[in-house]
Each structure stands twice: as structure tokens, then as C-alpha cells.
């Protein structure tokens, strides 16, 4: 098992409801370390670049609007098989289908406002981290 990093965003629905501490507790209880964290207001340009893979999807505009509607918390998480572990901890995209104890089961309001984003691969984690963090921002 390899130590790796993954990227996380606590979305505007989470920050609006002051869930940062509660979500961080679930992350840390799962054995992941938060080695980088910043609360930011994502710009339209940042959101469009970040979700570029969904540009042709019908929900793209709504997604960009949502992600820029309030502060988000961007994070770098580190641990054994961090990408897979965090995806398990997040739970299914649809909170109704998420397993008990997962972030989305506990906190998500809907498929669209599902509290968190997590990288889907180690390669994407590197790209996503680089969009929001310099190496000097990460303290392992």
C-alpha cells in the first residue's frame, strides 16, 4: 500500500451550513491527514477550468453557478491509498444511495448539493491539487 495524496473540495452547501469541522472529523477518523487546506471563493474561471470535463453536459452551467455561490474549502489529503479511501469515505454521489457513516449520507442535501468533491484517480488528484496549491502550501 502506497501513501498518496488526493484532492477534496467542501462545496458551498457544506460551508454555508458550517460543516467544515464535522467533515474534517470524518476524514481524519478514516485515517487520512489534511496536509493542505484553504477556504476560498472560487471564481467562475476557476470553476469552469476545474469542471472542464463536464463542459458539454447539460448541468455544467448550474454546476459552475453552484460552485461559485459561496466559499469552498479546498484540501490536500494524504494517506494509504488516499484516492480510493476518500472516495469510500465520501459515499455515493446520490446521498440516498450512500452507505451509512459516509460524508454524503451524513451531510449531503441532494445529488447536486452533495457536500464534497474528491479526485477520481491519482493522476487527476495531482492536476487538481496543482490548480489550487503550490508545493509550499502543503505541510506533510
From Swiss-Prot:
Principal EC category: transferase
GO CC annotations, alphabetized: cytoplasm
Positions of the catalytic residues: 117
Keyword Flavoprotein among UniProt keywords: no
EC number: 2.7.4.6
Cofactor requirements of the protein: Mg(2+)
InterPro entries assigned to the protein according to its UniProt record, in alphabetical order: NDK-like_dom, NDK-like_dom_sf, Nucleoside_diP_kinase
One of the record's GO molecular function terms: nucleoside diphosphate kinase activity
Catalysed reactions listed for this entry: a 2'-deoxyribonucleoside 5'-diphosphate + ATP = a 2'-deoxyribonucleoside 5'-triphosphate + ADP; a ribonucleoside 5'-diphosphate + ATP = a ribonucleoside 5'-triphosphate + ADP
Compartments where found: Cytoplasm
Keywords carried by this UniProt record: ATP-binding, Cytoplasm, Kinase, Magnesium, Metal-binding, Nucleotide metabolism, Nucleotide-binding, Phosphoprotein, Transferase
Domain of life: Bacteria
Binding locations of ATP: 11, 59, 87, 93, 104, 114
Chief site of localization: cytoplasm
UniProt cross-references to PROSITE patterns, sorted A to Z: NDPK_LIKE
The keyword Kinase is assigned to this record: yes
SUPFAM superfamilies: Nucleoside diphosphate kinase, NDK
Gene Ontology biological process terms, A to Z: CTP biosynthetic process; GTP biosynthetic process; UTP biosynthetic process
Family: Belongs to the NDK family.
Summary of the function given for this chain in its UniProt record: Major role in the synthesis of nucleoside triphosphates other than ATP. The ATP gamma phosphate is transferred to the NDP beta phosphate via a ping-pong mechanism, using a phosphorylated active-site intermediate.
Assembly information from the UniProt record: Homotetramer.
Name used for this protein in its record: Nucleoside diphosphate kinase
Amino acid at each position: 500500500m502506497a501513501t498518496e495524496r488526493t484532492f477534496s473540495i467542501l462545496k458551498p452547501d457544506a460551508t454555508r451550513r458550517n460543516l467544515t469541522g464535522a467533515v474534517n472529523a470524518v476524514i481524519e477518523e478514516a485515517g487520512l491527514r489534511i496536509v493542505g487546506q484553504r477556504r476560498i471563493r472560487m471564481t467562475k474561471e476557476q470553476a469552469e477550468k476545474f469542471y472542464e470535463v463536464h463542459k458539454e453536459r447539460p448541468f455544467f452551467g448550474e454546476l459552475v453557478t453552484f460552485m461559485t455561490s459561496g466559499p469552498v474549502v479546498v484540501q490536500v489529503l494524504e494517506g494509504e491509498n488516499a484516492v480510493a479511501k476518500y472516495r469510500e469515505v465520501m459515499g455515493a454521489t446520490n446521498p440516498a444511495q450512500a452507505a451509512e457513516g459516509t460524508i454524503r449520507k451524513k451531510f449531503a442535501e441532494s445529488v447536486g448539493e452533495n457536500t464534497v468533491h474528491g479526485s477520481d484517480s491519482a493522476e487527476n488528484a495531482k492536476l487538481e491539487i496543482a490548480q489550487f496549491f503550490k508545493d509550499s502550501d502543503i505541510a506533510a
